[in-house]
């Protein structure tokens, strides 16, 4: 038997690559008259397929051998209509037999253990052929991140019981708080808020929730991949039937598209939940990076890390993303721990997406860091190598996040909005998407995702409360924290780049000071729709800023001339002020923007530039731009903890 280190030596040899690299189709190829299964297993001595009628339980209907072909591919033809039949492979490698699902499975039974052959058009939602990716103007590209479970788990959300915490909750129209007909929730709330995209936390099949058990006491964010090309069963109304999760996932996407909202998929190719997974059971050790002794490298912090630089691993990742883009009409992809992928793989993926019809509209961005030390010895897709990435691959900018609200690893560390001394210097860098700074080697502002909160770490509200108080009352409507929340939003929603927000940030979402709730209770993680109604003024503030931003396209421009056009004022510290002229012919509602940030608890007097300026937002109301003109000039007052915005008329 080979040792893990010997497998590593083999897999990294040029001879192995020449003999086994394969560019053709893999997985099930369905036809009404028969289905062909193809599996890449170059180190196997024998491969067979086990056939089942059900996704769990029941006896095996029979076992058939696969034939070995060139480049490490095995295949078998199953005559007759195989739609709805389940299967596993038994792969014998170096004297050990592994029973596993198909790495290229399109759907599966309970907990993803058995793959299912699927005739997708047979079960697609009505008019699915007419669904398409949404074209979102750059000025409306704001991302709202949510878990499928969190979106509608609250009993007060107004969604029917059977759909709560499921894909189908995104399809129900007309929901209101406690079904009282007043405050809109879920899909109707999103439409009113005005975001351009919803980023869904993992919706592929993950292993940390048991789909065969009630979900009452189970919860996980889902960063535990089991089957990359299969929707998660616990989000369907019937995880025992493989076709249901596929159809309902597509219904969710179609509903969001019909509402004019794009769908971004959070993908986690950097690691898998267990080492006993379809990839490692098919070709042990190949798909995961190894330490010199052959053991798994752990740059993900989850026990293993995907070897994107190995040719067939790269093919798998690209094939999978293409499948979701084409079969599910996904509008964008957010890459978890993108620093664990090599630059070449990410750039090849970007080029491959661009080659699809309409593929240049598909967004690509990710976390430009790792979860630990890695054995990736090629250029990593991280912040340091941003200049090597395609200009159309973006990154989460933790520089912007930390300067605005304070570091995420120290609960008490303040940022600019909490009065951190000297932080105003870096606010200017954030406004210009760091394109006028040597901190980040960005090609253009469109590479920068500007944000202050995401699912990781403290919610924005909890962070503000932890900095302000030794013993925070998280549920209280604290007026000072509310003002700081508005200021934080006023800053990053006027920064260049693409804004991003955690769902509920706009209504002071709290997790009671817990910074990592990936497997905490459903009640702690779910969106609190009563709180959304309670903090409706804050919701309206975000809504107004989103609308204002859409009226001034240059904030979302991708050219490097736009950051260079920002003019900063010399003001009393720690105030920050700047102007940006509209780009010629971009349809902006105002000739220029003039923005001031006041992070102090006092009113401040400043002088506007020459000209006539309309007050668009005063730091409390962000919808003044919609009303009658209030023309300002000369000296004006900035409210405490405020972002004040003027438009030149």
Which residues fall in each region the model found?
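C-terminal accessory region downstream of the catalytic core in glycan-modifying enzymes
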Residues: 52, 477, 481, 527, ...
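Substrate-binding/active-site clefts of carbohydrate-active enzymes
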Residues: 149-328, 337-357, 374-375
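C-terminal beta-strand-rich structural cap/linker in extracellular carbohydrate-active enzymes
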Residues: 41, 84-87, 628-649
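Conserved, mostly hydrophobic/aromatic
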Residues: 39, 89, 146, 200, ...
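Carbohydrate-binding surface patches
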Residues: 29-45, 565-609
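Glycan-recognition and catalytic regions of carbohydrate-active enzymes
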Residues: 19-24, 485, 494-514, 526-593
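Conserved alpha/beta catalytic core and glycan-binding cleft of carbohydrate-active enzymes
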Residues: 118, 350-351, 355-356, 360-507, ...
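The feature marks proteins involved in alpha-glucan
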Residues: 1-32, 68-172
């Amino acid at each position: 038997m080979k040792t893990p280190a010997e497998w590593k030596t083999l897999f990294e040899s040029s001879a192995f690559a020449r003999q086994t690299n394969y560019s053709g189709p893999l997985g099930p190829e369905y036809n009404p008259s028969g289905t062909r299964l193809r599996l890449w297993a170059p180190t196997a001595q024998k491969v067979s397929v086990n056939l089942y009628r059900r996704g769990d339980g029941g006896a095996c209907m029979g076992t058939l051998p696969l034939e070995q072909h060139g480049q490490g591919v095995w295949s078998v033809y199953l005559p007759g209509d195989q739609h709805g039949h389940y299967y596993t492979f038994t792969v014998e490698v170096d004297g050990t037999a592994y029973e596993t699902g198909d790495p290229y499975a399109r759907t599966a039974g309970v907990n993803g253990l058995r793959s299912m052959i699927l005739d997708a058009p047979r079960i697609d939602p009505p008019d699915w052929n007419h669904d398409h990716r949404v074209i979102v103007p750059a000025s409306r590209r704001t991302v709202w991140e949510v878990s499928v479970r969190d979106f509608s788990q609250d009993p007060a959300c107004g969604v029917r019981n059977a759909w709560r915490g499921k894909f189908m909750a995104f399809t129900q129209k007309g929901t209101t708080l406690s079904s009282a007909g007043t405050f809109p929730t879920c899909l109707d709330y999103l439409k009113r808020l005005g975001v351009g995209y919803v980023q869904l936390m993992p919706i592929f099949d993950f292993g940390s929730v048991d789909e065969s058990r009630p979900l009452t006491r189970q919860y996980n964010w889902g960063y535990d991949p089991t089957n990359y090309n299969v929707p998660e069963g616990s989000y369907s109304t019937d995880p025992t039937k493989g076709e249901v999760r596929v159809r309902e996932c597509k219904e969710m996407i179609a509903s969001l598209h019909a509402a004019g909202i794009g769908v971004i998929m959070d993908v986690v190719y950097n690691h898998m939940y267990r080492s006993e997974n379809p990839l490692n059971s098919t070709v042990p050790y190949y798909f995961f990076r190894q330490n010199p002794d052959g053991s798994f490298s752990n740059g993900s912090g989850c026990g293993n890390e995907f070897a994107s630089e190995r040719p067939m691993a790269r093919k798998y990742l690209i094939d999978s993303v293409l499948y979701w883009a084409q079969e599910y009409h996904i509008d964008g992809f957010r890459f978890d721990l993108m620093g664990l992928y090599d630059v070449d793989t990410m750039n090849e993926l970007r080029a491959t997406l661009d080659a699809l019809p309409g593929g240049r509209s598909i967004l690509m961005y990710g976390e430009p860091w790792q979860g630990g030390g890695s054995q990736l010895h090629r250029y990593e897709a991280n912040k340091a190598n941003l200049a090597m990435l395609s200009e159309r691959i973006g990154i989460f900018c933790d520089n912007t996040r930390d300067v605005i609200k304070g570091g995420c690893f120290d609960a008490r560390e303040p940022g600019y909005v909490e009065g951190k001394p000297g932080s105003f210097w870096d606010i200017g860098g954030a406004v210009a998407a760091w394109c006028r700074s040597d901190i980040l080697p960005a090609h253009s502002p469109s590479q920068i995702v500007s944000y202050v909160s995401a699912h990781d770490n403290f919610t924005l509200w909890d962070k503000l409360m932890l900095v302000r108080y030794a013993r925070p009352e998280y549920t209280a409507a604290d007026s000072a924290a509310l003002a700081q929340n508005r200021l934080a939003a006023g800053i990053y929603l006027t920064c260049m780049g693409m804004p991003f927000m955690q769902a509920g940030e706009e209504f002071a979402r709290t997790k009671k000071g817990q910074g990592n709730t990936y497997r905490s209770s459903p009640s702690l993680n779910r969106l609190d729709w009563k709180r959304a109604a309670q903090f409706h003024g804050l919701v309206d503030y975000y809504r107004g800023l989103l609308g204002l931003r859409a009226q001034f396209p240059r904030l979302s421009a991708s050219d490097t001339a736009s950051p260079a056009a920002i003019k900063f004022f010399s003001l009393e510290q720690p105030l920050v002020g700047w102007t940006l002229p509209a780009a010629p012919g971009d349809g902006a509602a105002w000739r220029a923007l003039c923005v001031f940030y006041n992070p102090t608890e006092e009113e401040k007097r400043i002088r506007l530039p020459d000209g006539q300026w309309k007050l668009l937002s005063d730091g409390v109301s962000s919808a003044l731009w919609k009303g009658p003109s209030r023309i300002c000039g000369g000296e004006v007052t900035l409210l405490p903890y405020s972002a004040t915005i003027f438009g030149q008329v």
